[in-house]
Protein backbone atom coordinates (compact mmCIF):
# COMPACT_ATOMS: atom_id res chain seq x y z
CA UNK A 1 0.00 0.00 0.00
CA UNK A 2 1.20 3.48 -0.86
CA UNK A 3 0.03 6.41 1.29
CA UNK A 4 0.07 9.94 -0.15
CA UNK A 5 -0.87 12.90 2.04
CA UNK A 6 -1.71 16.11 0.21
CA UNK A 7 -2.20 19.51 1.82
CA UNK A 8 -5.70 20.15 0.45
CA UNK A 9 -8.69 18.38 -1.06
CA UNK A 10 -7.83 20.05 -4.36
CA UNK A 11 -4.31 18.59 -4.33
CA UNK A 12 -5.71 15.19 -3.35
CA UNK A 13 -8.11 15.38 -6.29
CA UNK A 14 -5.34 16.40 -8.69
CA UNK A 15 -3.21 13.43 -7.64
CA UNK A 16 -6.07 10.99 -8.06
CA UNK A 17 -7.01 12.46 -11.44
CA UNK A 18 -3.46 12.14 -12.72
CA UNK A 19 -3.58 8.42 -11.98
CA UNK A 20 -6.96 8.00 -13.67
CA UNK A 21 -6.02 9.97 -16.79
CA UNK A 22 -2.76 8.07 -17.05
CA UNK A 23 -4.64 4.78 -17.12
CA UNK A 24 -7.14 6.18 -19.63
CA UNK A 25 -4.34 6.96 -22.08
CA UNK A 26 -3.60 3.29 -22.77
CA UNK A 27 -3.86 2.22 -26.41
CA UNK A 28 -6.71 -0.24 -25.84
CA UNK A 29 -10.21 -0.36 -24.44
CA UNK A 30 -9.77 0.96 -20.93
CA UNK A 31 -12.17 0.03 -18.13
CA UNK A 32 -12.44 2.33 -15.15
CA UNK A 33 -14.68 2.40 -12.10
CA UNK A 34 -15.46 5.61 -10.23
CA UNK A 35 -17.15 6.39 -6.94
CA UNK A 36 -20.08 8.63 -6.18
CA UNK A 37 -20.36 10.66 -2.99
CA UNK A 38 -18.69 13.79 -1.65
CA UNK A 39 -15.01 12.84 -1.82
CA UNK A 40 -14.65 12.84 -5.64
CA UNK A 41 -16.58 16.05 -6.34
CA UNK A 42 -13.49 18.21 -6.88
CA UNK A 43 -11.84 15.50 -8.97
CA UNK A 44 -14.86 15.37 -11.27
CA UNK A 45 -14.85 19.16 -11.63
CA UNK A 46 -11.31 18.83 -12.96
CA UNK A 47 -12.02 15.70 -14.96
CA UNK A 48 -14.93 17.01 -17.04
CA UNK A 49 -12.96 19.58 -19.08
CA UNK A 50 -10.05 17.15 -19.36
CA UNK A 51 -12.07 14.41 -21.08
CA UNK A 52 -15.15 16.06 -22.61
CA UNK A 53 -15.17 15.66 -26.37
CA UNK A 54 -11.66 14.16 -26.45
CA UNK A 55 -11.41 11.43 -29.10
CA UNK A 56 -8.52 9.74 -27.30
CA UNK A 57 -10.91 8.73 -24.51
CA UNK A 58 -13.68 7.42 -26.76
CA UNK A 59 -12.94 3.76 -25.98
CA UNK A 60 -13.05 4.16 -22.21
CA UNK A 61 -15.77 2.10 -20.53
CA UNK A 62 -17.16 3.01 -17.12
CA UNK A 63 -18.30 0.44 -14.55
CA UNK A 64 -20.32 1.34 -11.45
CA UNK A 65 -19.43 -0.87 -8.51
CA UNK A 66 -22.57 -0.68 -6.35
CA UNK A 67 -26.21 0.31 -6.44
CA UNK A 68 -29.41 0.39 -4.39
CA UNK A 69 -32.10 0.34 -7.09
CA UNK A 70 -35.44 1.94 -6.41
CA UNK A 71 -38.55 -0.23 -6.62
CA UNK A 72 -39.92 -0.06 -10.15
CA UNK A 73 -36.73 1.53 -11.49
CA UNK A 74 -33.71 -0.01 -13.19
CA UNK A 75 -31.50 2.61 -11.55
CA UNK A 76 -30.66 3.85 -8.09
CA UNK A 77 -29.07 6.91 -6.48
CA UNK A 78 -25.52 6.08 -7.53
CA UNK A 79 -26.46 6.06 -11.21
CA UNK A 80 -28.27 9.37 -10.91
CA UNK A 81 -25.48 10.96 -8.86
CA UNK A 82 -22.84 9.90 -11.37
CA UNK A 83 -24.93 11.19 -14.26
CA UNK A 84 -25.09 14.55 -12.50
CA UNK A 85 -21.45 14.75 -11.41
CA UNK A 86 -19.50 13.32 -14.33
CA UNK A 87 -21.28 11.36 -17.05
CA UNK A 88 -23.72 14.09 -18.04
CA UNK A 89 -21.31 17.05 -17.92
CA UNK A 90 -18.60 15.04 -19.74
CA UNK A 91 -21.15 13.85 -22.34
CA UNK A 92 -20.35 10.17 -21.79
CA UNK A 93 -22.89 8.03 -23.61
CA UNK A 94 -25.05 5.64 -21.60
CA UNK A 95 -23.75 2.80 -23.79
CA UNK A 96 -20.33 3.22 -22.18
CA UNK A 97 -21.65 3.16 -18.62
CA UNK A 98 -22.22 -0.28 -17.09
CA UNK A 99 -24.20 -0.61 -13.88
CA UNK A 100 -25.38 -3.27 -11.48
CA UNK A 101 -28.99 -4.41 -11.76
CA UNK A 102 -31.28 -7.01 -10.25
CA UNK A 103 -30.78 -9.08 -13.39
CA UNK A 104 -27.03 -8.88 -13.99
CA UNK A 105 -25.35 -8.89 -10.58
CA UNK A 106 -24.61 -12.64 -10.66
CA UNK A 107 -22.85 -12.20 -14.03
CA UNK A 108 -21.23 -8.80 -13.42
CA UNK A 109 -17.76 -10.10 -12.60
CA UNK A 110 -17.78 -12.26 -15.73
CA UNK A 111 -18.89 -9.26 -17.80
CA UNK A 112 -15.96 -7.29 -16.39
CA UNK A 113 -13.57 -10.16 -17.11
CA UNK A 114 -14.74 -10.50 -20.71
CA UNK A 115 -14.27 -6.74 -21.17
CA UNK A 116 -10.63 -7.06 -20.09
CA UNK A 117 -10.88 -6.30 -16.38
CA UNK A 118 -10.92 -3.01 -14.49
CA UNK A 119 -7.75 -1.00 -15.12
CA UNK A 120 -8.28 1.54 -12.35
CA UNK A 121 -10.93 2.01 -9.68
CA UNK A 122 -11.37 5.05 -7.46
CA UNK A 123 -13.20 4.49 -4.18
CA UNK A 124 -13.87 6.46 -1.03
CA UNK A 125 -13.59 5.42 2.60
CA UNK A 126 -16.93 5.52 4.37
CA UNK A 127 -17.28 7.20 7.75
CA UNK A 128 -17.83 3.77 9.30
CA UNK A 129 -15.18 1.95 7.30
CA UNK A 130 -17.39 0.75 4.48
CA UNK A 131 -16.25 0.66 0.87
CA UNK A 132 -18.50 0.36 -2.16
CA UNK A 133 -21.60 -1.32 -0.69
CA UNK A 134 -19.54 -3.45 1.71
CA UNK A 135 -20.57 -2.43 5.20
CA UNK A 136 -19.47 -3.26 8.74
CA UNK A 137 -20.34 -6.70 10.10
CA UNK A 138 -22.03 -7.84 6.90
CA UNK A 139 -19.22 -8.00 4.33
CA UNK A 140 -18.27 -11.50 3.13
CA UNK A 141 -14.53 -11.11 2.61
CA UNK A 142 -14.42 -14.06 0.20
CA UNK A 143 -17.19 -12.76 -2.07
CA UNK A 144 -17.32 -11.42 -5.59
CA UNK A 145 -20.36 -9.29 -6.54
CA UNK A 146 -23.35 -10.04 -4.31
CA UNK A 147 -26.62 -8.62 -3.08
CA UNK A 148 -27.68 -7.97 0.50
CA UNK A 149 -31.14 -7.34 1.93
CA UNK A 150 -31.02 -3.78 3.18
CA UNK A 151 -33.06 -4.43 6.32
CA UNK A 152 -30.57 -7.13 7.34
CA UNK A 153 -27.73 -4.66 6.82
CA UNK A 154 -29.63 -2.10 8.88
CA UNK A 155 -30.05 -4.52 11.78
CA UNK A 156 -26.27 -4.83 11.97
CA UNK A 157 -25.82 -1.07 11.50
CA UNK A 158 -28.71 0.63 13.35
CA UNK A 159 -27.59 4.15 12.41
CA UNK A 160 -28.40 3.50 8.75
CA UNK A 161 -31.52 5.34 7.61
CA UNK A 162 -34.63 3.54 6.38
CA UNK A 163 -34.84 2.88 2.65
CA UNK A 164 -38.29 1.37 2.12
CA UNK A 165 -38.13 1.81 -1.67
CA UNK A 166 -34.62 0.31 -1.98
CA UNK A 167 -34.86 -3.24 -0.63
CA UNK A 168 -31.48 -4.55 -1.81
CA UNK A 169 -27.88 -3.43 -2.05
CA UNK A 170 -25.92 -4.79 -5.01
CA UNK A 171 -22.17 -4.40 -4.78
CA UNK A 172 -18.87 -5.64 -6.06
CA UNK A 173 -17.37 -7.60 -3.19
CA UNK A 174 -13.85 -7.66 -1.79
CA UNK A 175 -12.67 -10.32 -4.22
CA UNK A 176 -13.99 -8.27 -7.14
CA UNK A 177 -11.77 -5.40 -6.04
CA UNK A 178 -8.78 -7.68 -5.63
CA UNK A 179 -8.98 -8.26 -9.40
CA UNK A 180 -8.70 -4.52 -10.17
CA UNK A 181 -5.27 -3.71 -11.58
CA UNK A 182 -4.90 -0.38 -9.77
CA UNK A 183 -7.00 0.62 -6.77
CA UNK A 184 -7.09 4.23 -5.55
CA UNK A 185 -8.75 5.29 -2.29
CA UNK A 186 -9.39 9.00 -1.69
CA UNK A 187 -10.11 10.30 1.81
CA UNK A 188 -10.76 13.91 2.74
CA UNK A 189 -12.11 15.98 5.59
CA UNK A 190 -11.48 16.02 9.33
CA UNK A 191 -14.57 13.88 9.90
CA UNK A 192 -12.69 11.01 8.23
CA UNK A 193 -9.58 11.32 10.42
CA UNK A 194 -10.60 8.69 12.97
CA UNK A 195 -11.71 6.07 10.45
CA UNK A 196 -8.63 6.76 8.35
CA UNK A 197 -6.45 6.03 11.38
CA UNK A 198 -8.38 2.82 12.08
CA UNK A 199 -8.11 1.72 8.46
CA UNK A 200 -4.34 2.24 8.44
CA UNK A 201 -3.51 0.87 11.88
CA UNK A 202 -5.99 -1.91 12.63
CA UNK A 203 -5.64 -5.48 11.40
CA UNK A 204 -8.21 -6.83 8.96
CA UNK A 205 -11.56 -6.95 10.73
CA UNK A 206 -15.29 -6.96 10.01
CA UNK A 207 -15.97 -3.76 11.95
CA UNK A 208 -13.83 -1.83 9.45
CA UNK A 209 -14.34 -3.87 6.28
CA UNK A 210 -12.10 -1.60 4.21
CA UNK A 211 -9.13 -3.08 6.09
CA UNK A 212 -9.32 -6.09 3.75
CA UNK A 213 -8.18 -3.83 0.91
CA UNK A 214 -4.72 -3.55 2.45
CA UNK A 215 -4.14 -6.97 0.88
CA UNK A 216 -4.52 -5.50 -2.60
CA UNK A 217 -1.19 -5.64 -4.46
CA UNK A 218 -1.53 -2.15 -5.98
CA UNK A 219 -3.43 0.11 -3.57
CA UNK A 220 -2.76 3.85 -3.36
CA UNK A 221 -4.41 5.84 -0.56
CA UNK A 222 -4.53 9.60 -1.15
CA UNK A 223 -5.67 11.72 1.80
CA UNK A 224 -5.87 15.42 2.38
CA UNK A 225 -4.20 16.92 5.44
CA UNK A 226 -7.47 17.13 7.40
CA UNK A 227 -8.16 13.42 7.00
CA UNK A 228 -4.57 12.59 7.93
CA UNK A 229 -4.37 14.62 11.15
CA UNK A 230 -4.24 11.49 13.35
CA UNK A 231 -1.68 9.66 11.22
CA UNK A 232 2.03 9.36 11.80
CA UNK A 233 3.39 8.11 8.45
CA UNK A 234 6.95 7.97 9.76
CA UNK A 235 5.86 5.31 12.22
CA UNK A 236 4.32 2.94 9.68
CA UNK A 237 6.80 0.22 8.84
CA UNK A 238 4.64 -1.45 6.21
CA UNK A 239 3.76 1.58 4.09
Protein language model features and the residues they cover:
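N-terminal glycine-/serine-/threonine-rich phosphate-binding loop
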Residues: 1-32
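Glycine-rich N-terminal segment of FAD-binding domains in flavoprotein oxidoreductases
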Residues: 26-51
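Glycine-rich beta-strand-to-loop/alpha-helix junction loops that act as flexible
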Residues: 34-39, 123-127, 188
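Ligand-binding beta-strand-loop-alpha-helix segment within the catalytic cores
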Residues: 55-122, 235
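Active-site histidine-anchored catalytic micro-motif
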Residues: 58-73, 117, 131, 140-144, ...
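A short secondary-structure junction signal
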Residues: 110, 132-137, 143, 195-199, ...
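Class I SAM-dependent methyltransferase SAM-binding "motif I" and its flanking Rossmann-like core
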Residues: 127-175
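ATP/nucleoside-binding phosphotransfer catalytic cores, i.e., glycine-rich phosphate-binding loops
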Residues: 180-239
